[in-house]
Amino acid sequence: YAYLESRGMAEHIDRFCVDLEQKGPLKNRIILPMTIDGKNVGYTARTIVDQKPKYYHWHQSHYVFNTDYVKNSYKYCLVFEGNMDAILLNGVAVMTNTISPEQSIIINSLGKEVIVVPDQDKPGLELIDKALEYGYAVSFPKWEEGVKDANDAIIKYGKLFTLVSILNSVETSPAKIEIKKKIMSANV
């Protein structure tokens, strides 16, 4: 539980499971159930120590994490790469650095303004390309070096500042998104 608290997840601990037997492939991992309409359809298990692989996933293909929690919230839908970001800021996660056509359909079915928040690293650049392909807005928050994603930003700046910085950094113009992507690529 100390790991979850250190990542700013204290208020969300009830959403996680911990492998109490501490052996096998789930040793030293927190387990996050994946649901669709309240039914478990898979899980992701994240290591809490320095070991590879960082994640184990078992879920339906093209799954979009956290849709059950965003259906009745906000007028926008924040799309992240990682589950932790999605939980902390009530968004969804594609759990990779791309968005499949099937995931795009699921995201669009939420009926919200879509804002993609890529990780600030090289793989995040690929997510920007997919956002452009699907006509989504992209957020380019100005966080300090070493702050790779929204979870890192929450730990450094707090939840409110992180959310405001995301919402105040949204670009909808494809030309401006391309320019900001080039600037970002020079810094990652």
Question: For the regions a protein language model found, what residue spans apply to each?
Answer:
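TOPRIM metal-binding catalytic domain and adjacent DNA-binding surface shared by DnaG-type primases
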Residues: 1-37, 71-72, 108, 167-188
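Phosphate-handling DNA/RNA-contact segment within nucleic-acid enzymes
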Residues: 6, 22-113, 127-128
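Short, surface-exposed amphipathic charged segments that create phosphate/polyanion-binding patches used
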Residues: 29, 108-112, 148-162
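Acidic beta-strand-to-loop metal/phosphate-binding motif
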Residues: 79, 112-123, 142
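Generic detector of well-ordered alpha-helical packing
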Residues: 82, 86, 120, 150-153
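Acidic, metal-coordinating catalytic cores used for nucleic-acid/nucleotide bond scission
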Residues: 99-100, 118-128, 145
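Active-site-adjacent alpha-helix of alpha/beta-hydrolase-fold enzymes
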Residues: 127-136
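A generic structural motif
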Residues: 137-148
